[in-house]
Amino acid sequence: MPSVVINGPKIDDIEIKRKLVKDITDALEKAYKLQREAYTVVIKENSPENVGSGGILIVDKYKKA
């Protein structure tokens, strides 16, 4: 069944995560017309020292000089 994986920085507020999962599920339900239980949403939180962009670690890219 349809699934969505979100890769991004850590979200500390559980209420924001709940809303994010609900909103994405709402959009999937509208698009696919399946029961809500058919969808899976996974939030993968990545620390800045584990992600690179343009060949540079995020932790280095936004490091204060």
Where are these regions (language model features)?
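A domain-level signal for the structural core that forms small-molecule/cofactor-binding pockets
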Residues: 1-65
